[in-house]
């Protein structure tokens, strides 16, 4: 009888330990794919908008996306690659620019600027690196707005140049979303 009780306890203990191990592995794989942006976890199971609204570093971008009426577009299936400027990036613009852009009468200009930060398709850093290699050191990206961005490596940093000659550095790459990928940038990119 003691042998049977011991066997049952051993089986229960093994099953319990196996369950804990599976849960731990599942949590580790989720956390491995989840990046922190603006103090918030960016979950690859959520879309671009649902993640961005949680980043304290992207409140200006989120407000601009709402003002431009782009929420539904960026919640759609995509996939999209978004070069997401931080609040500090927007702060670099001349004083009053953001306040002016979010006014209803400037919606077309705001939409043009925001869609200039979006490329159709999911281009993670490996895909961008491959495009840079194929372009012999520089990749040309076509934006949803219809303009061009150029990407290259400067040391170990990915640099993006806009049509006006402005330069932005990717500060956090490969923030995977259910409908694409976000690369956090430190300067607002401006089309012609």
Residue ranges and their predicted role:
Residues 14-23:
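C-terminal segment of classical bacterial N-terminal signal peptides
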Residues 1-9, 18:
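Bacterial N-terminal signal peptides that target proteins for export
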């Amino acid at each position: 009888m003691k042998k049977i009780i011991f066997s049952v306890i051993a089986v229960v203990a093994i099953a319990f330990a196996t369950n804990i191990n599976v849960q731990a592995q599942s949590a580790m794989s989720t956390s491995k794919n989840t990046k922190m942006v603006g103090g918030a976890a960016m979950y690859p199971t959520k879309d671009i908008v649902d993640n961005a609204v949680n980043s304290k570093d992207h409140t200006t971008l989120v407000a601009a996306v709402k003002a431009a009426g782009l929420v539904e577009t960026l919640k759609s299936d995509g996939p999209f690659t978004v070069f997401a400027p931080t609040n500090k990036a927007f702060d670099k613009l001349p004083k009053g620019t953001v306040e002016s852009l979010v006014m209803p009468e400037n919606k077309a200009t705001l939409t043009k600027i925001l869609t200039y930060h979006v490329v159709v398709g999911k281009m993670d850093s490996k895909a961008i690196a491959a495009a840079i290699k194929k372009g012999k050191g520089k990749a040309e990206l076509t934006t949803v707005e219809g303009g061009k961005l150029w990407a290259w490596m400067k040391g170990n940093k990915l640099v993006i140049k806009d049509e006006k000659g402005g330069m932005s550095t990717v500060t956090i790459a490969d923030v995977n979303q259910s409908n694409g990928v976000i690369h956090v940038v430190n300067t607002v990119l401006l089309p012609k």
